[in-house]
Amino acid sequence: MFDFYFNDKLAAVDAKFEAQKIAFAPLSFQADKALRNLGILEEIGHHKKDSTIKDIATKLSLSEYGVGVLAEMGLGIGIFKLIPQNDEKAPLCYTLGKVGFFLLKDEMTKVNLDFSEDVCYKGAENLIDFIKNGKPEGLKVFGTWKTIYEGLSKLPDQAKKSWFGFDHFYSDLAFPEALPIVFKNKPKELFDIGGNTAKWGIACCKYNPDVHVSILDLPGQISVAEANAAKEGLSRRISTKPVNVLDPNSKVPEGANAVWMSQFLDCFSLSEITSILQKIREAASATTDVYVLEPLWDKQRFEAAAYSLQATSLYFTCMANGNSKMYRFEELTNAVEDAGFELKEAHHDVGINSYSLLRFRIK
C-alpha cells in the first residue's frame, strides 16, 4: 500500500518548492497558529468575496500590518486564495483555499495541530540530542518523569486535553468495526491493557451485555478509568488493576478470554513489546485471543496518513519515551510472534483512519 515511496515523480521546480516549505516550516506553523487563534482564519472562511485586510483588521481590532503579513503567508502556503478584481488598484480580497478549508473545518487536522502545538512543539527543539541519547529529553518541559505516561494525569490541562484528543480521535473511530471482530468468539472476560479512560471498555459493555472488562494500566491512570466507568453505571462490569508492564516483577493476571491493546504497543520498543507479550503468554490459555489495534504506516491508503504516522514517531522520540515509534506491519508482527504467539487474522483498513486489527494466539 505504500507504492508512493518507490517513485520520485516530482518535477525539480516542485521539489525545490517543497524544500523551501521545510526550510520555513516553523514560521508557517506559527503563522497558522496565529491565523487560527486571532480569528483571522475563521473570519475569512465566513466571507466568500469581500475579505480585505482593512476589513479584517477593523473587525478583529488588529493592525493592518499584522493581518497583512499573516494573510500573505497564508497565500504562500495555500491557506488563502485571492479573488480577481476588475480594478487593479482595488485592495486584495482574500478567500479560503482548499488547505484553509481543512485547517478550519477538518477535525483530524485540528487534532493534529493541537497535539503538535500543545504537546510536541517546545519539547522537540533539540531533536538531535534525543536521537543520540535515546531519552525523551523534551518531556522536561512538563515534568521529571521517565515517560509521558507516568505523568499523563499531571500534564497541564491544555496539553492533557490535546493528548487525549489525539489518542482517542484515531482509535475511537475504529471501534465500531473492531467490536464485531473481537466479539465473534464471545469473550466473557476481556483484559484491556493500557485502557486509559475506559472508552474501549465502555464500548464493549454497551455492545455485549455479558462481558466483563478488566483494565490494566498505570496506577496514576486507573482512577480516570474508574470515574468514567462509574459515570456510565458500569462499575460492576469494568474493574481495574494497577500494573506497570515494564516492571520486571509485574504479572498479567490469568483468566482472560481476550486481551485487547489499542494504540498501546507503539508506546514501547520492539524488545519491550516482546517482553510484554511474554507476560501475556504466561497468563494466557490456548484459546485466549490477543487483539492488537494499531495504525501501521505501511498499511495506509493515503500518503498523508503515512506521513502523519511518521511524524508521530518523532513525538515518541522526543516526548513520550525515547525508544518507540509507529511501526510497520512486519516489524510489529515479528515482535509479538517472538514472544511465542502466532498471527491468526489481520484486518487492515479498519475504520476511516486505516487501522490494522491483528489477532494472535499461542503457537
For each of these PLM feature ranges, what is it?
Residues F4-L10, A15-K48, T58-K59, Y65-K188:
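Conserved Class I S-adenosyl-L-methionine-dependent methyltransferase catalytic core
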Residues M1-L82, K184, E189-K363:
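Alpha-helical subdomain
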